[in-house]
Amino acid sequence: MYGIKIYNTLTRKIEEFKPVSPGFVKMYVCGPTVYDYNHIGHGRVYVVYDALKRYLALRGYHVLHVMNITDIDDKIINRAHQEKRDWREIAETYTRDYLESLGKLNVKVDLHPRVTEHIKEIIEFIQILIDKGYAYVAPSGSVYFEVDKYPEYGELSGRTNKELWSQEKEFISEKKKPYDFALWKAWKPGEPHWDAPWGKGRPGWHIECSVMSSRYLGRQFDIHGGGTDLIFPHHENERAQSEAAFGVKPWVKYWVHTGMVMMGSEKMSKSLGNIIPLREAFKEWGPETLRLWYLTSHYRRPLVFTEESIRQAQKYYERLVSVTNTIKKLSREAVSLHRMNDEDLKILEKLLEIRSRFHEALSNDFNTPQALAVISEFMTLVFKEIQYNPKYMLVLTAYKLLREFNTVLGVLDKYLVETPEELETLLDNVINIVVDIRRELRERKLYDLADRIRSELGKHGIILMDRGKETTWMRRK
């Protein structure tokens, strides 16, 4: 099996993937600020890291996937003022929309920490930075990270010129340098606040992710994800404050970023007013089509929205459903057993080669468009050859391969859930295959192997009865 390689934004290289703890992957992805409905740009982030998690699990890793919910922020407060509603009501409304969107996209996140549930930990983290000399309290009661104290600042984003670091310009008058950033924002009348040793206020944006990721994944973890628009300043600031607080380098082993969803030449964003809400996209095209569409472009590249690209994803999904139904039908109808001839073996070799190339694509920096192209070859093979030569071994191999593909794609779950009757038929088919192979072993006088098969099946309640060259079987009641 191919070793997994992935692009690391920090080093600008594709690197061999080796988690901090062998066999266990800890992954943090920046989640939404819940002040509005999710749009299809958000959906790409959700699906890409879910599919990456699924592939790592397929390769035998245990993956802990954490994605935060920012439920207190300037945007939430502003929305609450505009609508004359409580900020908590705003956050809860759009949190529900976010979680419903994940469900429809078949995205499974292990933990969803919320900022408001971690205020105590945030205050403690800021105090550590103050005590270590990396942060200072301004006269207003706001707390800022002193960027010049962290020499590696700018490495993640590639911004070596300090003139490109300026941020949070509305606070520039009380900061030591224009590029220092807020860890704690002093309270203003009409805003929510919490008490802290340096004065009441609320957390800055960047500190939240550092605290919640380390709370659940420890002081060093494997993958930190998000869109490329978060590299600066958000992820640059996270890295600086976390390595300063923990004294651990690297804080994150692999920085993995997804490209933006584009509307023509512009990034899809609420500020530009060119968004398509996910809830509308679900009605128009369906979540399965959207999920596949997100995977048609390499995760690091921009994904340009066009009606035609969505239609192509829809056709691909319809073909996947068709091939699934065809394979299930063949598994029920192909009742006769025959020895594999040379032509059968060639088809089997093609199936195994397709599986190998599927893993080759995903192992090489998670190349989903290449993996989808390989799956297209699989579908053609089923429709043009296996459909007209439904030998059990070929049909069973194709079925297992389809399930493996769907482990990552996640769009065929409702078609691959077997009823008890289908499971019974599948089990009977597998036993018949094993019995047929055992008969050939007996004909070749490989009695030790034949006896071993009889013994192993017997342990599972399957009794074989030989009568001359023929074998029948029954289940022990």
UniProtKB/Swiss-Prot annotation:
Zn(2+) binds at C30, C209, H234, E238. It catalyses: tRNA(Cys) + L-cysteine + ATP = L-cysteinyl-tRNA(Cys) + AMP + diphosphate. Its cofactor is Zn(2+). ATP binds at K270. Keywords: Aminoacyl-tRNA synthetase, ATP-binding, Cytoplasm, Ligase, Metal-binding, Nucleotide-binding, Protein biosynthesis, Zinc. GO terms for biological process: cysteinyl-tRNA aminoacylation. A motif ('HIGH' region) lies at residues 32-42. The keyword DNA repair does not apply. One of its GO terms (cellular component) is cytoplasm. It is found in: Cytoplasm. It is an enzyme of class 6 (ligase). SMART domains: DALR_2. Belongs to the class-I aminoacyl-tRNA synthetase family. This is Cysteine--tRNA ligase. It comes from Staphylothermus marinus (strain ATCC 43588 / DSM 3639 / JCM 9404 / F1). The gene is cysS.
